[in-house]
Design a protein with these regions (language model features):
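Amphipathic alpha-helical and helix-coil boundary elements used as assembly
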Residues: 1-284
Length: 284
């Protein structure tokens, strides 16, 4: 009706407020996690219960890091992304706050969630969480990554590193060459876990990112608790691709719903046949 008013709300974690703080600063003799923690604590007043670092590696101190004209959110996201640290958000039900969790390995994934594949039809039981409209996309990605840099203090040192994480996978092709990742040592390319911030470390990290784009999945679910950072497995018949059956990591969610009209008090329109429908994106 003409008297009807629509409202829109955007719900974001508290960390989103960091994009309102633009700074020019220099950080000396600190590692990436130390710089991030310093910004969260000293500049934004966050306390220990507001964030959690669950890291499996020890990151070296950098002589100098500059923040020039970047907002704090973009700055820490860039720094964390350089070394492969990712973050997600969880809820502390005791303190009633959101918590930012920073991780650098698969140990940070939340596992154990399994949902059935049930297409939306009259046979679907009300209130049963399910997955449908599953789709997979595949593409050819780079076969290996080469990195190169220059350390003026050891001008004759070999700073080349070449990594193929798949060790000869035939479905990949080509080489990605990266110069100037700003590392001081080449590292061991044969080590599965090379020294953090070495040439082999950056080469392996970059190749893993390319491989993450090799297979992408999308689906729709009615599960209200599913969120990025969780590993989802789907059970069912032939409609379930092997990637979903083996487990996929959820990287993005898009949720929407409609107001119910069953009680006669809602005049906005017909009842949504799939309340709480959520579109998810994932990779294997």
């Amino acid at each position: 009706s003409r008297d009807e008013t629509h409202y829109a709300l955007t719900l974001q974690p508290r960390l989103a407020l960091l994009n309102r703080s633009h700074q020019n600063a220099i950080y000396q003799d600190q590692s990436v996690p130390q710089i991030v923690e310093k910004i969260l604590r000293e500049r934004h007043g966050l306390r220990g219960q507001d964030f959690l670092f669950s890291l499996t590696k020890t990151y070296p101190r950098r002589e100098q890091v500059m923040q020039y004209g970047e907002d704090d959110l973009r700055f820490i996201t860039r720094l964390l992304g350089e070394v492969g640290i990712w973050f997600r958000f969880t809820a502390d039900t005791r303190l009633h706050i959101d918590v930012a969790e920073f991780c650098d390995s698969q140990q940070g994934y939340e596992k154990g969630l399994t949902l059935p594949s049930v297409p939306p039809s009259g046979q679907q039981s009300a209130g049963v969480d399910a997955v449908w409209e599953m789709a997979c996309r595949h593409r050819v990605v780079e076969q290996q990554v080469s990195t190169r840099d220059y350390n003026y203090r050891e001008a004759t040192a070999d700073m080349n590193a070449q990594v193929d994480v798949t060790r000869g996978e035939t479905t990949t092709f080509g080489e990605a060459y990266h110069w100037g990742d700003n590392y001081l040592t080449a590292g061991n390319v044969h080590d599965r876990h090379p020294a953090p911030e070495s040439g082999a470390f950056y080469a392996r990290l970059r190749h893993e990112r390319y491989l993450n784009g090799q297979t992408r999945m999308q689906a729709t679910t009615s599960c209200p608790t599913l969120c990025p950072g969780q590993v989802l497995k789907v059970t069912g018949g032939e409609e379930v691709a092997g990637e979903f059956a083996d487990g996929v990591l959820v990287t993005a969610m898009h949720s929407h719903a409609r107001r119910a009209s069953g009680d006669g008090r809602d005049a906005a329109g017909p009842r949504d046949q799939h309340p709480g429908k959520r579109h998810l994106r994932a990779y294997r």
